[in-house]
């Protein structure tokens, strides 16, 4: 008999508490109108990739360790002579997380990684795009426990985009605040 998979902590929190709280706060007519997180995109741009084409592959390995799923090496869309960049050159890595892996990553991000960021004063509450999506940047990828600090040859920053079904920024802010995102006051 197959064992039942454990439900991620944040997914259970959303299903049990957050949905009800958002339904009461915004008075939705239909349960499908309640905002939810659809995906989390992690992007790591490697600026020095023009000199060394192996760096995006190393960044992709680190990103795969952080995300728990294989990262895709991103390539330049067009050539830029001033940056010595040619079309098709590898310039970074990205990974898209959905479902259980997304909730597990958000749990690790909020409870472990963000408190380890140096001089962390909270997330910028204005980083919403107007359609309910939130973007943030981390200057050092070594704040994640999956990365062994001794084996890292270079420290990279990364972008984290949280995509939601919220129609407005206020709905998205309430959703993420319910997930204990530490927004600056």
Curated annotation (Swiss-Prot):
Protein name, as recorded: Large ribosomal subunit protein uL5
Gene name, Swiss-Prot/TrEMBL: rplE
Keyword Iron-sulfur recorded: no
Listed NCBIfam families: PRK00010.1
A biological-process GO annotation: translation
Taxonomy of the source species: Bacteria, Pseudomonadati, Pseudomonadota, Alphaproteobacteria, Hyphomicrobiales
Organism, as annotated: Brucella canis (strain ATCC 23365 / NCTC 10854 / RM-666)
Gene3D superfamilies: 3.30.1440.10
PROSITE patterns: RIBOSOMAL_L5
Statement: the UniProt record of this protein carries the keyword Hydrolase: no
Family: Belongs to the universal ribosomal protein uL5 family.
Record's subunit section: Part of the 50S ribosomal subunit; part of the 5S rRNA/L5/L18/L25 subcomplex. Contacts the 5S rRNA and the P site tRNA. Forms a bridge to the 30S subunit in the 70S ribosome.
Annotated function: This is one of the proteins that bind and probably mediate the attachment of the 5S RNA into the large ribosomal subunit, where it forms part of the central protuberance. In the 70S ribosome it contacts protein S13 of the 30S subunit (bridge B1b), connecting the 2 subunits; this bridge is implicated in subunit movement. Contacts the P site tRNA; the 5S rRNA and some of its associated proteins might help stabilize positioning of ribosome-bound tRNAs.
Gene Ontology molecular function: rRNA binding; structural constituent of ribosome; tRNA binding
């Amino acid at each position: 008999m197959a064992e039942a998979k454990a439900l991620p902590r944040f997914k259970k929190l959303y299903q049990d508490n957050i949905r009800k709280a958002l339904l009461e706060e915004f008075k939705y007519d239909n349960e499908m109108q309640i905002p939810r997180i659809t995906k989390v995109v992690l992007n790591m741009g490697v600026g020095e990739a023009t000199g060394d084409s192996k760096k995006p592959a190393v960044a992709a390995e680190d990103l795969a360790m952080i995300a728990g799923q294989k990262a895709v090496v991103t390539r330049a869309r067009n050539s830029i002579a001033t940056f010595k960049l040619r079309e098709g050159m590898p310039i970074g890595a990205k990974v898209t997380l959905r479902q259980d892996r997304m909730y597990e990553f958000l749990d690790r991000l909020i409870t472990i990684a963000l408190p380890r960021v140096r001089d962390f004063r909270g997330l910028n509450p204005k980083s919403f795009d107007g359609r309910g999506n939130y973007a943030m940047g981390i200057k050092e990828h070594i704040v994640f426990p999956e990365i062994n600090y001794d084996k890292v040859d270079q420290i990279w920053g990364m972008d984290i985009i949280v995509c939601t079904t919220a129609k407005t920024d206020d709905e998205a802010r309430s959703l993420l605040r319910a997930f204990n995102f530490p927004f600056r006051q």
